[in-house]
């Protein structure tokens, strides 16, 4: 994978997150926090997990190993979640714009929140981050339908089509 391909994926990720957040803006607080049969309990919980995972992988990429995820309290409201996820996406963008091919092929050592040490190739960590976020955006889209809201599509091909004249 080239640095330009990485940047394309992270531009896409920020675009898709913004579309996801736009889909949430019509929700009232009750529907945002309503318990649903889902991995993370609610739209808020799933969004908090998505953002916290992006943050912890960014920290690992930077050479840090936080021992816990961001608290869900940072995502108490849609406005708080919007600000925090946008901030994380800006930090991710700043990080990936400085990468070259040698960086992408290098390894990062880190320790998980469970205390397990790992070492991965940087580009694999970046791909995991993108894949993980896509997976949970899909979950949020499904949860939005459960609370009678309409999610915006966040497919990569839609982003790529929007770039073409």
Task: Tell me what each language-model feature is.
Residues 7-22, 26-71, 112-165:
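Short, contiguous alpha-helical
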Residues 101-113:
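Carboxylate-rich helix-loop segments that flank metal/cofactor sites and access channels
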Residues 64-104:
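Helix-adjacent hinge/juxtasegments
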């Amino acid at each position: 994978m080239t640095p330009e391909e990485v940047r394309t994926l992270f531009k896409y990720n920020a675009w898709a997150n913004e579309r996801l957040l736009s889909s949430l803006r019509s929700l009232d607080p009750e529907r945002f926090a309503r318990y649903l049969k889902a991995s993370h309990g609610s739209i808020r919980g799933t969004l908090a997990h998505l953002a916290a995972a992006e943050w912890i992988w960014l920290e690992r990429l930077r050479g840090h190993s936080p021992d816990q995820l961001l608290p869900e309290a940072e995502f108490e409201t849609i406005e708080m979640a919007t600000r925090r996820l946008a901030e994380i996406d800006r930090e991710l963008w700043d990080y990936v714009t400085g990468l070259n091919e040698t960086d992408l092929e290098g390894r990062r050592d880190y320790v998980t929140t469970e205390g397990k040490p790992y070492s991965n190739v940087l580009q694999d960590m970046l791909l995991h981050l993108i894949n993980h976020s896509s997976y949970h955006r899909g979950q949020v889209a499904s949860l939005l339908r459960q609370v009678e809201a309409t999610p915006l599509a966040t497919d990569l091909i839609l982003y790529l089509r929007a770039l073409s004249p």
